[in-house]
Amino acid sequence: MAFLIILITCFVIILATSQPCQTPDDFVAATSPGHIIIGGLFAIHEKMLSSEDSPRRPQIQECVGFEISVFLQTLAMIHSIEMINNSTLLPGVKLGYEIYDTCTEVTVAMAATLRFLSKFNCSRETVEFKCDYSSYMPRVKAVIGSGYSEITMAVSRMLNLQLMPQVGYESTAEILSDKIRFPSFLRTVPSDFHQIKAMAHLIQKSGWNWIGIITTDDDYGRLALNTFIIQAEANNVCIAFKEVLPAFLSDNTIEVRINRTLKKIILEAQVNVIVVFLRQFHVFDLFNKAIEMNINKMWIASDNWSTATKITTIPNVKKIGKVVGFAFRRGNISSFHSFLQNLHLLPSDSHKLLHEYAMHLSACAYVKDTDLSQCIFNHSQRTLAYKANKAIERNFVMRNDFLWDYAEPGLIHSIQLAVFALGYAIRDLCQARDCQNPNAFQPWELLGVLKNVTFTDGWNSFHFDAHGDLNTGYDVVLWKEINGHMTVTKMAEYDLQNDVFIIPDQETKNEFRNLKQIQSKCSKECSPGQMKKTTRSQHICCYECQNCPENHYTNQTDMPHCLLCNNKTHWAPVRSTMCFEKEVEYLNWNDSLAILLLILSLLGIIFVLVVGIIFTRNLNTPVVKSSGGLRVCYVILLCHFLNFASTSFFIGEPQDFTCKTRQTMFGVSFTLCISCILTKSLKILLAFSFDPKLQKFLKCLYRPILIIFTCTGIQVVICTLWLIFAAPTVEVNVSLPRVIILECEEGSILAFGTMLGYIAILAFICFIFAFKGKYENYNEAKFITFGMLIYFIAWITFIPIYATTFGKYVPAVEIIVILISNYGILYCTFIPKCYVIICKQEINTKSAFLKMIYSYSSHSVSSIALSPASLDSMSGNVTMTNPSSSGKSATWQKSKDLQAQAFAHICRENATSVSKTLPRKRMSSI
């Protein structure tokens, strides 16, 4: 019996193969009468059966390769129309339909379109040529379909002639949003632009940048490829290879092209992520071959095949790797499930598809559900109505769950929305018309209403945008093996408006994170602290990793360039992942060098106080009086005290006050000190000047108080102008790489140099006067000269050191110079006198000083007599003779008188003198 059934089935198939399309009605897949007819285009069969490479006669060939999933789409349209007819949406108006099989061929779809455009209620079924189709009444009012963009474009160009509404449910090519080219086309799915943008976002988010892409050789595939290239570049993703497969299975080269594509995938070992824009039958063949070649990759699925049960049920499909895809947003299609349960109730005479399906079920009656789809595909031919209704019912009852398993929820919902959109538009159009009359309106009128209609699926409201698209978004799906079967699970949603993935729960987040474990990169990932250095390759994704230089950082992987730290406040070492705050530095109080300098300054202050006490207690002694008196000594000691104290303003955190105070305090006090010493040098020069004219001039010049006030006043003016016009301020020095130096900016180098230069001029004058007054056995001038030399040596050394020193120790250099010059002058001015006061009290008496003066006078006169000399200060040259000779010249006598006058002047002025009677070793220190 079973053998007989199989024999009869084979006979029917052979008979059907030999029966081409004889009449237009044979061409219709399903039909139902109504007041308003809606056309439908579905690729129910995968290809046309032709014995020739190219047709020789213009006839429609037989179609083979029955597709269960598209058969279900056809049923979804029928079900949606029946839902409207059974509702109150169009009271008294029945929607009918004519559904045609495109066989996945443009030519077949265009043939069906010609029948749609044929004149209504005309027996000849002709398409009339007119200059104006405004009043032309075609066979149908609108068309739903086709599924593939390539076919939809061709059909739409024909429908544009009459502006007949065409609502796509699966055609996603971006070009279809162009209302200039396709003014009558609308669709209930988003444009591919959004899908491709979401894919590029997913790839970038997962850390992949080296991928492959496979498309079809048609308008849809080429447009998708071009758009993806643009989005990939925007997301820094590189395409390692691009493979293009023939668009139709009838192409004899498809198997060769698939093999070449798989070999390319094997060669590109670093490419582990492949984007696939193919039709279901392409993917079916591709994956079967990939399983044979043991290829395991991550596949990014487009909405064409991401939820296709035909592919998920391929044996050992798990061996291909992981699949993440994008599917149309799901809706409530529970009523469609009930419709499938009662599929046998449809009238069989007008649904040839049901007869063909019944035939395939009979041929595959003993095949398991898992293999049933492939069995039907292999045995599919154009069906003849030879089965009884009772047999059909029995088969449907046996396999109704099988159909539901192959339903793609997103596509079913899109078809429902397409029918509902037309239904609501017809309702709005028929409110003032009698739509039971087929001539109530023209297709172009329906198009105008359809563009602005708001419709619902029972749960949500929808409307078309300005491009005729329905931006419902996408579901992101992941293929997972559950109980040994590959199952399509929803992983996330993609929000078109905000370009974000909406992840519902933590488990899904973990699945997203797991995608990052798959590596698909041309180059190894650059770690934080490194940047990408592009190689000679044409792809920016192929690069080398280079360490970030100093003061640069990267805190993420694969950054294209290193970020610059703020050089003013931060720094970074080589290969740094972050910037570090610069340490603020200045000559701090706890710095070892600062402590040492402070100790030296404090010792200097103590020494000044000790000297002041010694001089105060020995106020009336000749040594103190010969130093110019207590007032002059106190002024000099006060200046030294201020100089030592001024060093404290060079230490610690700089402030505007300390910056202004330290230089002016030192400059004025040191100038006052030098001015006082200058008057002493001038007095010594006056005391030992024997030229009457010079002596007279020096007497006129010698005005101690005026000299001190004038010299100091000039310095005060210099410092005042300095503070007014260019005062020293705190400066944040950021030129060092790792530290910030807080320092005092002198404001004006010219003013600073003028202040120091003026002190140097006074010191030089003082040095000249002291050097000129440096007489034998009179050590005051010698010590002043030595003190000035110390000052000059210290400050001459200071200039190059100060100019080349950088950092927080610049103030320390100036402190050291101040201490050296201050100690030098203080030592030379007061140490010899303190030595006499403390250690040689026997010569610190008036009688001892007078004795030394007379002794020096006698010695000086003897020296003049014994040593021939020319006295240029006299009116003529006089030769000195021995004073013991019997005759003393007048000239010699005159010199003696002048010498006596000089020492008398010294006594009157309380000038110091060192006795000749002291031993040489003692005198040298006084």
From Swiss-Prot:
It is found in: Cell membrane. Isoform 1 is expressed at high level in brain, skeletal muscle, testis, bone, calvaria, osteoblasts and leukocytes. Expressed at intermediate level in liver, heart, kidney and spleen. Expressed at low level in lung, pancreas, placenta and ovary. Not detected in thymus, prostate, small intestine, tongue and colon. Isoform 1 and isoform 2 are expressed in kidney at the same level. Isoform 2 is expressed at lower level than isoform 1 in the other tissues. Its main location: membrane. Belongs to the G-protein coupled receptor 3 family. It comes from Homo sapiens. Residues 1-18 form the signal peptide. Changing residue 149 to A: Loss of function. PANTHER family: CALCIUM-SENSING RECEPTOR-RELATED, G-PROTEIN COUPLED RECEPTOR FAMILY C GROUP 6 MEMBER A. Residues 616-631, 691-704, 770-782, 832-926 are cytoplasmic. Homodimer; disulfide-linked. Glycans are attached at residues 121, 259, 332, 378, 452, 555, 567, 590, 733. The chain crosses the membrane at residues 595-615, 632-652, 670-690, 705-725, 749-769, 783-803, 811-831. GO terms for molecular function: G protein-coupled peptide receptor activity; G protein-coupled receptor activity. It is a multi-pass membrane protein. Keywords: Cell membrane, Disulfide bond, G-protein coupled receptor, Glycoprotein, Membrane, Receptor, Signal, Transducer, Transmembrane, Transmembrane helix. This is G-protein coupled receptor family C group 6 member A.
